[in-house]
């Protein structure tokens, strides 16, 4: 009888060890939030009021392709974004081109303002802040700081 209890206690020890090893591998809602898929699901399921509550407090540190995805969410859910009343204006807006073109139709030369739209500007100063310098750090950025880099959003002043 004593021998049977000792054998059973050995199997209980083994079961306990296996359980301690396996339990951390089972995804929980809290653990899922720390994976990329979990964050995507969290961002997708948030309501407008949820976004307003976390906009200035929640920080995320993102680099490279994860930074691009984070910027997508910040631009998409920007709580200060102004909605457009009329169609989106782009650099090739016909009215703007007609106003700035002084050459007759069919000219081989572009007006200087129109030609400059095709040039990319480069930062000359290496110390100029960038989204990577700001948000690819241990502290990360708030949603508000990410949204400041949204390329096409018109935003309300909130300060």
From Swiss-Prot:
One GO MF term attached to the UniProt entry: insulin receptor binding
Principal place of residence: secreted
UniProt keyword terms in alphabetical order: Cleavage on pair of basic residues, Disulfide bond, Secreted, Signal
GO biological process, one term: insulin receptor signaling pathway
Record carries keyword Secreted: yes
Subunit structure: Heterodimer of a B chain and an A chain linked by two disulfide bonds.
Protein name in the entry: Insulin-like peptide 7
Organism: Drosophila melanogaster
Primary gene name: Ilp7
């Amino acid at each position: 009888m004593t021998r049977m209890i000792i054998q059973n206690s050995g199997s209980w020890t083994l079961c306990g060890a296996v359980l301690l090893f396996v339990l951390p591998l089972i995804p929980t809602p809290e653990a899922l939030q720390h994976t990329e898929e979990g964050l995507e699901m969290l961002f997708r399921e948030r309501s407008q009021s949820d976004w307003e509550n976390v906009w200035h407090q929640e920080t995320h540190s993102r680099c490279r392709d994860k930074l691009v995805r984070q910027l997508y969410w910040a631009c998409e859910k920007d709580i200060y974004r102004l909605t457009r009343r009329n169609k989106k204006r782009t650099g090739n807006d016909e009215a703007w081109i007609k106003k700035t073109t002084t050459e007759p139709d069919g000219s081989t030369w572009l007006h200087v303002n129109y030609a400059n739209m095709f040039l990319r500007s480069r930062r000359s100063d290496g110390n100029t802040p960038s989204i990577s310098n700001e948000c690819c750090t241990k502290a990360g950025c708030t949603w508000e700081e990410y949204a400041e880099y949204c390329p096409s959003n018109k935003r309300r002043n909130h300060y």
